Amino acid sequence: MSAPADTLKSALDRTFASLRHGLETYTAQLTPHEVGTITRVSTGIAMVSGLPGVGFEELVSFSGNVFGIAFNVDETEIGVVLLGDYGHLHAGDPVRRTGRVMDVAVGEGLLGRVIDPLGRPLDSLGPVVSSARLALERPAAPIMDRAPVTVPLQTGLKVVDALIPIGRGQRELILGDRQTGKTAIAVDTILNQRGQDVLCVYCAIGQRAAAVARTIAVLREKGAMEYTVVVVTEGNDPPGLAYIAPYAATSIAEHFMEMGRDVLVVYDDLTQHARAYRELSLLLRRPPGREAFPGDIFYIHSRLLERATHLRPERGGGSLTALPIIETEAQNMSAYIPTNLISITDGQIYLSPSLFELGVLPAVDVSKSVSRVGGKAQRAAYRAVTGDLKLAYAQFEELETFARFGARLDENTQKIIEHGRRIRACLQQPESAPVSMAGQITVLLALTAAFFDGVPLARMTAAEQAVLQAAATLPAELQTRFDTAMKLSEADRATLIQLARDALKPFVPPPAESRRTSAP
């Protein structure tokens, strides 16, 4: 073979070898996407076919930057819960898998912001700055990572801190009929965390826009937005947003807890959450159970509230305190959702419509309220003065029923009733006016010592304010001792008793006048 032919052959060999090497090492730059189509769109849901590889609760993407969560995964089609405005979606539109689950922005940048469950800002303050993202659904802390509840969470409400104490890491249910002050108790608790190194997350689920705006205005006015994140879904939002709202709020709170911070999260309210889940389940043709709720409604709430805990020091020592709110109908505490949440939580605060109508605010029915773990976290200074108070108030509530029938009462019974009326008057307080620990202990000690018994009921509010103003003048070191595990010393007790007695002197009439002005 001639030299030119050899040269051509070797050149071709080199070329083919280079092509073979290129084919062997070639990696396609194309990313495969699984695309399905919408078969049907209904209120808040869409049925989708053509996504055989989709996972349960995987996020899927629709046109118009609308997302949904795969809720029902069947062999031929999936049921998707829509998380945005779906008015433009129609049968035949494409649907794409994202390969990830729903998550939310977390971090210090959310403090002071009002967002929706997707992390989108609602307050016209620009985009949300976040340091990380966390999945909405996260497993609760293992048992061995949890620590006992030992530190109190002061609400600033005398009736709660004294008789139904809450600890950091506890789950305390707030329930009552409509318009009985449930949200007011939660908001007052948030206001009282100012200066307490507690961050707050307020989650409004399916609430009226006007009511949410009022709550946010109160938080801004009192300076509470500095340490609060507000997660909002309105009544006209898709039910899917209402369903994921409490999980988003909990993930935001868990981020701070895992950093070693103490966090308070308020769910207002889980009745709307249960109704949104019921609506979605019925639309997806899931079998209904009691009151048409699906069979897993208990699990839906238990897996949410089990994420509230107090972590061991090795895990950072943070805590997440949950205050779920539930609305009852006609004072029926034994309905399905209320009984579920009573069994899940560590106690409940029940608000009575009867007390509300009498003007007793907050309208807490102490006999139907309980805190199962908060008592262990209550400060010793409280325990020293509240034990006798609980007994006296319970006796008063029992005897008050008989007094309404106009029965003749002996002198001792009349004293118990008069003392109980003054306890009830002292436990009342206006909205958005939390009371300091020193003020509460001074008032409660004066109540236990029966110093208020000589004060006419009409002057109880002024008398209590006088005691609170006097308590504000206590030495700083004495006020600091209240917030420790130390018991009240005899000297401190004597100081408080003398202070209360001096403050009440102008309000106690002479004996003859006292007999004329005492309540029947």
From Swiss-Prot:
Key words of the record: ATP synthesis, ATP-binding, Cell inner membrane, Cell membrane, CF(1), Hydrogen ion transport, Ion transport, Membrane, Nucleotide-binding, Translocase, Transport
InterPro entries listed in its UniProt record: Alt_ATP_synth_F1_asu (IPR017710), ATP_synth_asu-like_sf (IPR023366), ATP_synth_asu_C (IPR000793), ATP_synth_asu_C_sf (IPR038376), ATP_synth_F1_a_nt-bd_dom (IPR033732), ATP_synth_F1_asu (IPR005294), ATPase_a/bsu_AS (IPR020003), ATPase_F1/V1/A1_a/bsu_N (IPR004100)
Keyword Cell membrane: yes
Annotated site residues (Required for activity) in this chain: 369
Highest taxon listed in the record's lineage: Bacteria
EC number(s) stated in the UniProt entry for this protein: 7.1.2.2
Binding site for ATP: 176-183
Catalytically driven reaction(s): ATP + H2O + 4 H(+)(in) = ADP + phosphate + 5 H(+)(out)
Cellular-component GO terms for this entry: plasma membrane; proton-transporting ATP synthase complex
Molecular function as annotated in GO: ADP binding; ATP binding; proton-transporting ATP synthase activity, rotational mechanism
Homology family: Belongs to the ATPase alpha/beta chains family.
Assembly description: F-type ATPases have 2 components, CF(1) - the catalytic core - and CF(0) - the membrane proton channel. CF(1) has five subunits: alpha(3), beta(3), gamma(1), delta(1), epsilon(1). CF(0) has three main subunits: a(1), b(2) and c(9-12). The alpha and beta chains form an alternating ring which encloses part of the gamma chain. CF(1) is attached to CF(0) by a central stalk formed by the gamma and epsilon chains, while a peripheral stalk is formed by the delta and b chains.
Reported function: Produces ATP from ADP in the presence of a proton gradient across the membrane. The alpha chain is a regulatory subunit.
UniProt-recorded name of the protein: ATP synthase subunit alpha 2
Organism for this UniProt entry: Polaromonas naphthalenivorans (strain CJ2)
Taxon lineage: Bacteria, Pseudomonadati, Pseudomonadota, Betaproteobacteria, Burkholderiales
